[in-house]
Amino acid sequence: MEYISPFDRFIRHFDSALRVMSGVSAASRPSPASGVADGVLDDAERRHSAGLMRVNHVGEVCAQALYQAQAQFAHSDAIKQQFELAGREEEDHLAWTAQRLRELGSHPSLLNPLWYAGAYALGTVAAKLGDARSLGFVVETERQVEAHLNEHMNRLPPQDAKSLAVVAQMSADEVAHGSAAQALGAQAVPPLAQKGMQAISKIMTTTAYYI
C-alpha cells in the first residue's frame, strides 16, 4: 500500500480545494448527460434549471470540503481511505454539475469559498468527535442530500433531460456512500443535530439558487 505522508496529504487537499473553488475539477466518469438530447427550455425554465443545478453544485463543493476534512482528521487508516474514495467519486458530481451550468449559460455560486470553508469546519468538528460519529454525520448528510436531489427531480422541467440524468445518478451515488459509511460502524446523529443540519442546508439551498 502506498504510504502518504501527512505533508503530502495536506498538499493534495490544498490542491483539491483550489480546484474545487476555481471550478476546474475533472470527472473520472463520463457525465450521465452525455448522449442525452437537450430539451427545449424557455428563458424562465432555463433560469430555474440553472438555479437548481447551482444548488446541486454547491452541495458538491460542500461534500468535497466535508470529505477532505473528515479524511484529514480520521482516526484510522481504513476510515481515512473510505472518505478519500467517496470524495473522489463526489468530484464527478462537481464536474458534472459545473458542466451542466455552463450548458445552461449560467455560473456556480459566487459564495463557493464561504460554503467550502463552512463545510470544512463542520467536517473537522465531526471528525474530532471520533470515527463512528464522523461516519454517522456522513450517513445523515447523504440521507438529506438524497432527499433534496429527489425533490429536484420533481422540480426540474420535465424536458430538461440532461439535468435530470445528472441528478438521478448523483442520487444513486449518495445512497451508496451512505450505505458504505453505515457498514463501517456509523453512530446515529442526535435528532437535535439533524435539525441543525437541515437548517443550515435550507439557508445554503435558498441562497445558492440565486447567487
Swiss-Prot record:
The gene is coq7. One of its GO terms (cellular component) is plasma membrane. The lineage of its organism: Bacteria, Pseudomonadati, Pseudomonadota, Betaproteobacteria, Burkholderiales. GO terms for biological process: ubiquinone biosynthetic process. SUPFAM superfamilies: Ferritin-like. Gene3D superfamilies: 1.20.1260.10. Keywords: Cell membrane, Iron, Membrane, Metal-binding, Monooxygenase, Oxidoreductase, Ubiquinone biosynthesis. InterPro entries: COQ7_proteobact, Ferritin-like, Ferritin-like_SF, Ubq_synth_Coq7. Pathway: Cofactor biosynthesis; ubiquinone biosynthesis. It is found in: Cell membrane. Its cofactor is Fe cation. Fe cation 2 binds at E90, E142, E174, H177. Belongs to the COQ7 family. Catalyzes the hydroxylation of 2-nonaprenyl-3-methyl-6-methoxy-1,4-benzoquinol during ubiquinone biosynthesis. CDD domains: DMQH. It holds the Pfam family COQ7. It is an enzyme of class 1 (oxidoreductase). It catalyses: a 5-methoxy-2-methyl-3-(all-trans-polyprenyl)benzene-1,4-diol + AH2 + O2 = a 3-demethylubiquinol + A + H2O. One of its GO terms (molecular function) is metal ion binding. This is 3-demethoxyubiquinol 3-hydroxylase. Its EC number is 1.14.99.60. Binds 2 iron ions per subunit. It comes from Herminiimonas arsenicoxydans. It is a peripheral membrane protein.
